[in-house]
Amino acid sequence: MVNDTFEQALQNAINIARLAPSSHNCQPWSVHYDAATRCGEVSIDRQRALKGLPSLEREMLMSCGIFFEYLSTLLKHSGYPLDWQWVGARQNGSSGMLISFAPSAPCVADLVAYQQWVQRISDRHTVRTAYQPTQVNEQQQAQLYALFDRSPVTCDIKYGEATRHDVAFLTANYASLDFADQQAWRETYHYIRFNEQQAAEDGFYLHHLFGPVSCGFRWFFRIAFHPRLSWLAKRLRLPASMAKGLAELVVEGPQYLALSLEHESDENLFIAGMKLGQLWLMLQSWGWSLHPLSVLVQHATARCALADTVRLTGLPVFFARFGQHRQSGIPTPRRAWQRILTTTQHSFSPENGADVKQP
C-alpha cells in the first residue's frame, strides 16, 4: 500500500467502503475519477436509489455519506487525504452528483489505522437479533456525543423501561406501514432474495431479517407477501403480526439513539451519514451493533409521534436500537468495486493532436 498510486489507493478504498450499510442494501453510490484532471465525484446512482417514498431520499443521502466517510478515511490513512466540496444532487438534475473531490498533498501512510478501519468496516454488520442487556455508560455516551461536536447533527440517546415500552408501542402501531404503501412495498419486495443458493450483488435474504429459516417459510413469505397478493396478507393480518413480532424485539432495547437536524438540507443529511458512519464503527469497536428502525422515521405520522413520545431534540432522520450483540451479524451481498468506480483516462492522439478519452 505504501507505494500505491492514487488510482490504486482509490480502488483499494472503494473495495472496502462498498461494505457500507444502506437501506435495503441498495448501495446507491457511484464514483467517477478523471485521471488527467485528478478530480473525481461521488454521486447518487439514480438507477439504484430507492424511490418508493419521498422520505427515502433522506436515507439515500445518508447512505452515500456513510460510504464517503469510509472512502475518504481509508484514503487518508493510505497517504492520500482528499480535498472535497459539496456540490449537491438537486442542483445537478439527473446526474445525482453530491460532492467533488481531488487528492491533496500526499502524507505518510498510517498502516495501523488503515488496517483498523479495514477490520472494523469488514466486521460491521446490521444485527437485528436480541442484544445483551448491557447499558451504555457515561463514558461511552460522552464518546458518542463527541462525534457530533461542531456538526449540524444532534444525537439523542434514550434508555429506561418507560422508553423501551414507548418505542415498542410505536413499533406495534406503525410498523405495518411498511406494507401499506403499494409502491414502497413493491420496491422492498424487489430487494428480497429468496434463493439463498443464488449469488446476488445487492438486497438481502430472509435470514438477514429472521435468522435461519426453513424452505417452507421462504415459500410462504414469498407468496403471502407478494405485492399482488396484499389483500391476502391483510386478510390474514400478517402485517399486524409482523409489527407485533418486531415490537417484542424492540422492547428489549436495551437503548436507542436518534439523529436529528435543525436544518434538514441535502448537505446536512450527507454529513449526518458521515457522522453515522463514524458512530457505527465506534460501536463495532466495542462489540456493539445497531438495528435501524426505519419505519418510525419514513412516515410523517410515525416520525412526529416518535419525536413527541420519546422527547427527542427534533424530528429524527435516523432512529435505531443499539447494544452489545450476542452474536455477530451476517454479511450481505455486495457489488464489486468495478461496478462502482468509473474512470476516464486521457491519451494523446498523434493524428489530430486531440485528447482521446478512454472509459
Curated annotation (Swiss-Prot):
The protein's Enzyme Commission number:
1.-.-.-
UniProt pathway: Antibiotic biosynthesis; prodigiosin biosynthesis
Q: What happens when the gene is disrupted?
A: Cells lacking this gene show a white phenotype, and produce 2-methyl-3-n-amyl-pyrrole (MAP) and 4-hydroxy-2,2'-bipyrrole-5-methanol (HBM).
Locate the coiled-coil region(s) and give their ranges.
none
**Alphabetical GO biological process terms:** antibiotic biosynthetic process
| A GO MF label | oxidoreductase activity
- Write down the required cofactor(s): FMN
Q: Which UniProt keywords apply?
A: Flavoprotein, FMN, NAD, NADP, Oxidoreductase
Q: Which InterPro entries would you find in this protein's record?
A: Nitroreductase-like
Q: Which residues cross the membrane?
A: none
**Entry similarity comment:** Belongs to the nitroreductase family.
Q: State the protein's purpose.
A: Involved in the biosynthesis of 4-methoxy-2,2'-bipyrrole-5-carbaldehyde (MBC), one of the terminal products involved in the biosynthesis of the red antibiotic prodigiosin (Pig). Catalyzes the oxidation of the hydroxy group of 4-hydroxy-2,2'-bipyrrole-5-methanol (HBM) to yield 4-methoxy-2,2'-bipyrrole-5-carbaldehyde (MBC).
Q: What is this protein called?
A: Probable NAD(P)H nitroreductase PigM
Q: What is the lineage of its organism?
A: Bacteria, Pseudomonadati, Pseudomonadota, Gammaproteobacteria, Enterobacterales
